[in-house]
Amino acid sequence: MAKISRRDLVISLSAAAAGAFLLPKTVTASGLEKIVKKGRLKQSVSWWCYQRNFKLPEFARIVADMGLTAIDLLQPNECEVIKEFGLICSMGYAEAAKIPDGLNNKANHDAIVKGLEKGIPLAEKMRVPNLIAFFGNRRGMSDTEALDNCVTGLNRIKKMAEDHGVNICVELLNSKVDHKDYQGDRSDFGLQVVKAVASPRVKLLFDIYHVQIMEGDIIRTIRNNHQYIGHYHTGGVPGRHELDDTQELNWATVCRAIADTDFKGYVAHEFVPTRDPIKSLSEAVALCDV
């Protein structure tokens, strides 16, 4: 199966945000049983993983029928589409949020800050709790310089985030498989940045798939640092596919560990299904409903 990344799909499909694909005949929203029963964790799902399969309104209805309350990684116009289904966007994009061109380089700060200055009030208005940000690629930069630059950039915008009650979540990504040269590829680096910024509205987007590839030790890291984490992503390792018995992690145990920290944010599924997409998502939601 050809490898698909979030970046590839966002680029190739952004012109058709609402989608242009037909819902498979075997899937009907009215026939879905509510899956979320316990609800200790608020679960969401990343839209980019399903853009090849569904129109956004149809997918939103399916997600709502499952018992989820949000969809992840939407553009502002897409946030409006899902409102009628009682859903919010759990993680939004701000302008100039680019994986390689991140906060580690001061040359990017003006564009990033401008995008967040526009995006934060809009996020508050649309009830989007989080906006994504990135550390950026190294390009030869030392971690010490990058850390200082990231803190400087986030300090410019943290007050606005605090005033509007919107979280800026900077994502940890792996540099071993998917994002070569990415600077924020270790939890220690990201934690140093967030601790130095010292704002309740600047957190990590802790992508469990990426952290597992780079360092493992998922549960202990979460338990010791949960106060610095604003959002979680799931994805099976290896391959970023279903959360099943082909994967390295015991996802129910991981999710129980998250719930035990009294986490109030979202755990968003960000895996690319290889089988029936709704069946795969349903199984993941049930597994993580701890």
Range-by-range predicted roles:
Residues S44-F54, P100-A111:
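Active-site mouth loops of central-metabolism enzymes
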Residues F59-E78:
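Catalytic domains of carbohydrate-active enzymes, especially glycoside hydrolases
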Residues A2-A64, R127-P129, G184-F206, H210-V290:
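Histidine-acidic metal/acid-base catalytic patches
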